[in-house]
Amino acid sequence: MAGTRILLVDNGSYEPAATLGLRDLAKSVSFLTKQEVRPVSTMHSTKIDPALLGGQPAVIFEGAVQQAKADGIDELVVLPLFIGPSRAITEYLPKVFADARPGAMKLSIRQPLFGDDGFELTGMLADNLRETGWTKGSGTVLLCDHGSPIPEVTACRNALAASLREELGLKPAELIACSMERREGAEYDFNKPLLEDALQDAKGDAVILMLFLLPGRHAGPDGDVATIAKEHAPAGLRWKLSPLLGSHASLPSLIELRHSVTTDLKPAKKFVLTTVLSMGLLPVIISLFAPKDMGLLGRMMLWLGGLAAIFVALYLYFRAKYWKKA
């Protein structure tokens, strides 16, 4: 078998700029990981004329899996270029992989960019906001994402809005989380408010803070977000778009961080098992090697010291073995 292949996977777009941006990001992440990282989309991108992509056709996940299978790859590692746990990465990619009859080849999907708490994204969004010239009190901030059919993704948007308010010292009316679009039906009300509605409550020099990664039909300078703002902003409201997250200098490092930390539970099980066994053997070791006349207090101190040493040694070992940077 030929080892591991790493894929940086985005949702895909019919716009060449999105694929070209994905390729640039993959190169930057490759430099950081010191391994080849291949740019791949879930769908759409193969419809782009290769002439608009420097003569190199785009690759979608289905084709990447088939190629990996033909090359004898034993594990595909997916780095999701997604903010939250989109169904594209929780359902679609595993299904496409299974349908390809991969045999012994494994699929590992790392965490999306939000991670556990969105800490890194909060800082990047704050940077992009300030880059527009915004200052506290200058105008309403509209944190805008695409809109999602699942609440878990919208929860990431709302958590980022809360973190930004705390970091910037803003009230809810000063920073509003909103969606570009949503599906019809009350079951999708969690996306509220829509950007077109949130604009009605905006004041001053408003900034639409883009929770989008790459330019395309939605997030380009003449994309859907800009069109909505032009058509629905109240008369007299000044507004501007922030840079996209894909342009932030820290994004490659964040992707590399997601690559370096796995969510595999096996190391944790090994850690717990090894710790329990070591704790059980510690009293036996102390009784064999401690002086016979050592009192209870001395033995307790030895036991506590040995316990601390075990935890430190095991932590350092498992961190180096399973959390090391690839």
Which residues are covered by each model-predicted region?
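Extended amphipathic ligand-handling, pore-lining, and cofactor/metal-binding catalytic surfaces
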Residues: 1-266
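Transmembrane helix-loop junctions and nearby membrane-interface residues
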Residues: 43, 287-292, 317-320
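N-terminal signal sequences
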Residues: 271-292
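Core hydrophobic alpha-helical transmembrane segments of single-pass membrane proteins
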Residues: 279-283, 304-312
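Non-cytosolic membrane-interface motifs at loop->transmembrane helix junctions
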Residues: 295-303
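Membrane-helix interfacial anchor on the cytosolic side
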Residues: 310-326
